[in-house]
Amino acid sequence: MAADYEPKPITTEHIVLSDEILELVELLAENAHDIWASERLRDGWTFGPERDDTKRQHPCLVPYAQLPDRDRDYDRTMVIGSIGAILALGFTISHTHSGVDPAP
């Protein structure tokens, strides 16, 4: 790390997420997990009770709903940070209610 590097995350403490956005958070957290899991499976990883980089096994290669709370919370925290930054930067998020099912 460069000695002069000072992280400056966007301030989001003033952002309040609506119930609708919190529903979006959960959908995006699950999607983030699915993207991560798809990449691992594509790279030859399998489920294992403990992480083992040599055997390419990982205990989180399960459906999102089966993840331990701490792992789901990690995904949610990352999504909340991103959505909070989007809103803090003055963008809006709206739902078109198109009826499209988010799952294939």
Predicted features along the sequence, with ranges:
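Alpha-helical propensity feature that highlights long, continuous alpha-helices across diverse contexts
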Residues: M1-P104
